[in-house]
Swiss-Prot record:
The protein's Enzyme Commission number: 1.1.1.385
Active site: Y152
GO biological process terms on file: antibiotic biosynthetic process
GO MF entries: oxidoreductase activity
Lineage start: Bacteria, Bacillati, Bacillota, Bacilli, Bacillales
PROSITE patterns: ADH_SHORT
Pathway the protein takes part in: Antibiotic biosynthesis; bacilysin biosynthesis
Name the record gives this protein: Dihydroanticapsin 7-dehydrogenase
Function: Part of the bacABCDEFG operon responsible for the biosynthesis of bacilysin, an irreversible inactivator of the glutaminase domain of glucosamine synthetase. Catalyzes the dehydrogenation of the C7-hydroxyl group in the 4S-tetrahydrotyrosine (4S-H4Tyr) to yield anticapsin (epoxycyclohexanonyl-Ala).
Keywords from the named record: Antibiotic biosynthesis, NAD, Oxidoreductase
Binding site for substrate: S139
Organism superkingdom: Bacteria
Family per similarity comment: Belongs to the short-chain dehydrogenases/reductases (SDR) family.
Record keyword rRNA processing present: no
Length: 253
């Protein structure tokens, strides 16, 4: 797995799975650009890591000029772009009959349209360079339906099909596109959602959530980051259009 000096851009890289991916790629001596809407958290990450291979760009991925700027910043800072990891995402809990249109649009804009915009401008550079690799964070919710998050499920179903479409369209240009479908991962975002939408202590809720899969535990962000490392490396060179499910066996039931 030789990722030394490869340039990797990660959206939503300031926390959770994204931050685990940042650390994983830095450990492989890659150059990492983080595009995240949380400027304070991004700057705190830069201070904590204190690594010349790490660069932060404040980015709202629902804004096309901001996406263009993020891609340009990666190329300007490190001289190229080898891997785009579309990881940023949000979740709003509400059944269809109670969901506001504004919240529906917000979830779709971040989870799906933002991925389209980042990919669009990354592909323009990758086509010129004659190679590239895009990794999308999908979800088990893109394969089966989690209860009470229809907008999230719909957006992730779209991510799965967008991944396949790009893989088919750009394989002839030496650009691979794959996605990872995590199950329930122990992240700050999920912890917040657990407390807002369930009764009990955080520890009690986590124990209950862990019962849904055969491994009887929540996933770790690092475990998803390891899948991303594999997809970014030549170890997965014959893979494109694939969806790797990392869910503790949930969808095998």
């Amino acid at each position: 797995m030789n990722l030394t000096d490869k340039t990797v851009l990660i959206t939503g890289g300031a926390s959770g799975i994204g931050y685990a991916a940042v650390q994983a790629f830095l450990n492989q001596q890659a150059n990492v650009v983080v595009a995240d809407i949380d400027e304070a958290q991004g700057e705190a990450m830069i201070r904590k890591e204190n690594n010349d291979r790490l660069h932060f760009v404040h980015t709202d991925i629902t804004d096309e000029p901001a996406c263009q700027n993020a891609i340009r910043s990666a190329v300007d800072k490190f001289g190229g772009l080898d891997v785009l990891i579309n990881n940023a995402g949000i979740e709003i809990v509400a059944p269809i009959h109670e969901m506001e249109l504004s919240n529906w649009n917000k979830v779709l804009n971040v989870n799906l349209t933002g991925m389209f915009l980042m990919s669009k401008h990354a592909l323009k550079y990758m086509l010129k360079s004659g190679k590239g690799n895009i990794i999308n964070t999908c979800s088990v919710g893109g394969v089966v339906a989690w209860p009470d998050i229809p907008a999230y499920n719909a957006s992730k179903g779209g991510v799965l099909q967008l991944t396949r479409s790009m893989a088919v369209d750009y394989a002839k240009h030496n650009i691979r596109v794959n996605c990872v479908c995590p199950g329930i991962i122990d992240t700050p975002l999920n912890e917040k959602s657990f407390l807002e939408n369930n009764e009990g202590t955080l520890e009690e809720i986590k124990k209950e959530k862990a019962k849904v899969n055969p491994l009887l535990r929540l996933g770790k962000p690092e475990e998803i980051a390891n899948v991303m490392l594999f997809l970014a490396s030549d170890l997965s060179s014959y893979m494109t259009g694939s969806a790797i499910t990392a869910d503790g066996g949930y969808t095998a039931q």
